[in-house]
Structures are given as C-alpha cells and as structure tokens.
C-alpha cells in the first residue's frame, strides 16, 4: 500500500483517526488505482488497515472483464453488508470497472452501498466522503470525465518499496468484440509526459528502483497528433532518470507494436527484457471476429523481430478459448501457434460474455464443457512450455533486483530477473533494493531457486 505524500510524521497514532480497508480485484491498473485511493484518503486523515472488521470505511475496487470477477465482487459485497449491520456508521464504497458498468443498478441490487464511483472519478473521493459524512445521502458518480486528474494522483512509496506502478494512460479505442474495457475505462487518454517524468523522479527520490508503466494499450500512448511524444520516446526519456534502474510496461497491442519500440529493447539498458503481448487466438478467422486488427502471420513476424533484436526476451500473452464460432480447427491453430512460439507464460481464459459488446450477438456459442476441455488442454501444454523455459535458465547467472522477503519462506529473499522470472535465494535484509548476481540452481513452474554470488553483489545507487 502506498503512503500519502502529506502523511504526518511520528510513530504515535491518534486514536480519533478513522480506518479505511481497501480490497482490490482485477488488473495492475486496479492495484495502482487502489494505491492512489489510499493516498487520497490518508491525506483526509484515514489510516489504512488490513482488517475489514476495524474499518470505518470500506472500498471495494472491482473488475468486470469477465463474469467470474463480477460475481466475486458481488459476493464480497454481501460479506460487507453483514459488517455494516453490526457497525451502523460503517461506509461502503464501490469503485472500478463493475461500478462504472452498473452504476445505479448496483445500488439497487445492494442498497447497503453508500457511494459508487467510476474509473474517472477517483480524485473526487475526498469530496464524496465529506458529503456523505455530513448528509448520509448516497452518491453515484460514474461520469466519464477527462481521466487525467484521476490517473495523475500521486502517492509516495512505503519505506523499502523497490518497485512502483505508474499509470501513463487510460482507456482504449480498439473495441475488440469481446471486451468491455472501452465502455468502462473510456477512450484513450494520455497523461502529459512531463507529469509522468515528474512522478518517476519523485519515486526515484524515495528509493524506488523499478517502474512499471501502465495503460490498457501503452503502445498507443499520445498518438493523437504527430507532434506528440510517443511511447518509445517516453521510454527514452525515462531511461535518463537517475536512480531508476529498470523499466517495464504493460499491456501492449500487437497491431501497435512499432519497430521503434521493438528496437528499444536493444537500445535502452534499463528496459527489461520482457513483453506481455496478448495474441488471443491462433486462428485468423477468430482474430477477425474478435476485431483484433492483425493476423497470425503479423503476430509471428513481430515475435520473430523481437527475438532478433533481443534474443533472451521473455514473451507472455493472453489467450481466449471458446470464442463464439471457434471450431476444433480454430482451436488447433491456437495450439499450433503456442507450439511455434513457446511462450514463457500464458494467461488463459474461457470466453466470458459481456453485455454491450459485439460478441454477445454472435452465433456459434461454444458450450461451457467444451470451453473447459479446451482450456485444460491449453493450460497443460503451456505448463510444459513454461517449465521448459525455466529449466533452460538452470546454471545461468542472472541479475536480480531484490524486492523483499519471499512469500513462501520468510528466511529467503525474492526478486525478479530482467525477463520477469521470480527468483528466491538466501540473503540478508540489507540487500533489499540492491541488484545482485544470482546463480540459478533449480527451476520450478512458477519460480526459480538460486544462490547469490557474493562477489557479484552490486549495491544500487
């Protein structure tokens, strides 16, 4: 959780301060949105808590990209409703994509909610809370304002925090036929480059070593006019910031992956050798129905170019099975593409119908049992590929940015390679924030086990 830039110093906590509990569902953008919410509410005097039972204010930051995520949010609201019945003055707020999508309808379904705010209204939260505290009247605000005030909210990192998210843009103009994002995040809107640079310098001044740039489609950053700075140029400016040692970004759209951006992987020393490049299907027919704007051969050509420019690049992707009209042959083409590319990792999903998208009206719905069967086949294959990729790293020496203690064993440190592989190894707490050299001894499906080479320790500046 991020700290507010105006948080008062000192170790004593005032007993009259209120507590806020934030639960986040969904993507990295939502995670960072929650960090910004925490910063805003800390400035208002709230203290973040990890225990919903002691909260005076609960905010659920929701996702609606798939039905499973939406149902999880609704289920969680039922639990919070029970808390509210025990604690009359508890305020419950709902934000994120499900809030944006349903608005007043969500309030009708769950009347215990006190306020609903959309994806473009985060910066208005302090005002919403003040109004509710005074009047106890419910608020629903999901207007798609210009989003820059919300995505530009600054939050300082916690002590010892090594990596931070930085939102550079919000929204999407692509309207893939299965995707609700353009409807809940709005059209593409980019933050001014000077604001982004200022935020990253601030993070560097507070000890952050790695930034991950966020956007629904970072490749289309500031493309409205030819005179604006593009994404590859932005990366080149961030490269110059003292104290920042690594840059990452997500997510990229294959059709917008330019040669200038591809060559950045060899030109920029701070740009990590990893790209998340959703391919969604290996069938040209399905890609056209999805309105993806590229073909299988287009995608393969970009992968080949990436691997030519940066031979050790790690490539991960998203894929959907069971899209309307997907035949056995279409699915086979997806499997063939996976075997051809051999992704480092893959985020795979069954097609989930989202109201308001073009795919809802398409014929050829695939049954749930068949979707599940295809998903299981695909995931089993990807596990083979992921383990194969990880095993290939055994015996190699990797630079690892130490992020903190391992979740699995508090005696171990954990960090990531440039290729975004998690590495666990023995070491002391003083190494957090340092770039260290680690010999990879053993590979697993989701992580690597290594041994730090003491003579290769390089303390970050």
UniProtKB/Swiss-Prot annotation:
Gene3D superfamilies named among the record's database cross-references: Methylthiotransferase, N-terminal domain, tm_1862 like domain
Residues noted as binding [4Fe-4S] cluster 1 in the record, renumbered to the chain: 27, 63, 97
Subcellular location: Cytoplasm
Top-level taxonomic group: Bacteria
All residue ranges annotated as the Radical SAM core domain in the record: 158-388
Single GO MF descriptor: 4 iron, 4 sulfur cluster binding
Keyword Transferase set for record: yes
Enzyme class, first EC level, given as a word: transferase
GO CC annotations on file: cytosol
Catalytic activity: N(6)-dimethylallyladenosine(37) in tRNA + (sulfur carrier)-SH + AH2 + 2 S-adenosyl-L-methionine = 2-methylsulfanyl-N(6)-dimethylallyladenosine(37) in tRNA + (sulfur carrier)-H + 5'-deoxyadenosine + L-methionine + A + S-adenosyl-L-homocysteine + 2 H(+)
Pfam family membership, one: Radical_SAM
PANTHER family hit by this protein: CDK5 REGULATORY SUBUNIT-ASSOCIATED PROTEIN 1, MITOCHONDRIAL TRNA METHYLTHIOTRANSFERASE CDK5RAP1
Subunit composition and interactions: Monomer.
Family: Belongs to the methylthiotransferase family. MiaB subfamily.
Function as written in the Swiss-Prot or TrEMBL entry: Catalyzes the methylthiolation of N6-(dimethylallyl)adenosine (i(6)A), leading to the formation of 2-methylthio-N6-(dimethylallyl)adenosine (ms(2)i(6)A) at position 37 in tRNAs that read codons beginning with uridine.
This protein's name: tRNA-2-methylthio-N(6)-dimethylallyladenosine synthase
Organism name: Syntrophus aciditrophicus (strain SB)
Lineage of source species: Bacteria, Pseudomonadati, Thermodesulfobacteriota, Syntrophia, Syntrophales
Gene it is expressed from: miaB
């Amino acid at each position: 959780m991020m700290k507010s830039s105006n948080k008062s110093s000192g170790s004593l906590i005032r007993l009259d301060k209120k507590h806020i509990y934030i639960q986040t569902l969904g993507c990295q953008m939502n995670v960072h949105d929650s960090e910004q919410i925490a910063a805003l509410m800390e400035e208002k005097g709230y203290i973040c808590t990890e225990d919903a039972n002691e909260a005076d204010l609960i905010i659920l930051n929701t996702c609606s990209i798939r039905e499973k995520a939406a149902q999880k949010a609704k289920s969680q609201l039922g639990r919070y409703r029970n808390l509210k019945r025990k604690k009359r003055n508890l305020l419950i707020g709902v934000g994120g994509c499900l809030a944006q999508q349903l608005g007043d309808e969500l309030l009708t379904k769950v009347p215990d909610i006190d306020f609903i705010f959309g994806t473009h209204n985060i910066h208005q939260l302090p005002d919403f809370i003040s109004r509710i505290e005074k009047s106890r009247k419910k608020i629903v605000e999901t207007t798609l304002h210009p989003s820059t005030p919300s995505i530009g909210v600054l939050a300082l990192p916690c002590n010892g925090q090594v990596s931070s998210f930085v939102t550079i843009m919000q929204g999407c103009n692509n309207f893939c036929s299965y995707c609700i994002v353009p409807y809940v995040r709005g059209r593409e809107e980019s933050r001014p480059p000077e604001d982004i640079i200022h935020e990253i310098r601030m993070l560097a001044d507070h000890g952050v070593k790695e930034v991950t740039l966020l956007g629904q489609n970072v490749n289309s950053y500031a493309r409205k006019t030819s005179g604006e700075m593009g994404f590859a140029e932005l990366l080149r400016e961030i490269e110059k910031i003292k104290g920042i040692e690594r840059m990452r970004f997500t997510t990229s759209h294959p059709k917008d992956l330019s040669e200038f951006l591809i060559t950045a992987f060899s030109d920029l020393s701070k740009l990590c050798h990893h790209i998340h490049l959703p391919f969604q299907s290996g069938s040209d027919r399905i890609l056209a129905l999805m309105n993806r704007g590229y073909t299988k051969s287009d995608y393969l050509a970009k992968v080949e170019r990436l691997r030519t420019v940066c031979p050790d690049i790690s490539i991960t992707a998203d894929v959907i099975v069971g899209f309307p009209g997907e035949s056995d042959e279409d699915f086979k083409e997806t499997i063939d593409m996976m075997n051809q590319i051999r992704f480092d990792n893959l985020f795979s999903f069954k097609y989930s119908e989202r109201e308001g998208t073009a795919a809802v009206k398409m014929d050829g719905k695939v049954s749930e049992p068949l979707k599940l069967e295809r998903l299981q086949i695909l995931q089993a294959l990807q596990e083979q590929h992921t383990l194969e990729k990880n095993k290939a790293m055994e015996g190699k020496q990797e630079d690892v940015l130490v992020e903190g203690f391992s979740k699995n064993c508090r005696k171990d440190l954990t960090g990531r390679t440039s290729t975004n592989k998690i590495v666990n190894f023995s070491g002391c707490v003083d190494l957090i924030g340092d770039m260290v050299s680690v010999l990879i001894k053993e590979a697993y499906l989701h992580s690597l086990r290594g041994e730090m080479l003491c003579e290769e320790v390089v303390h970050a500046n």
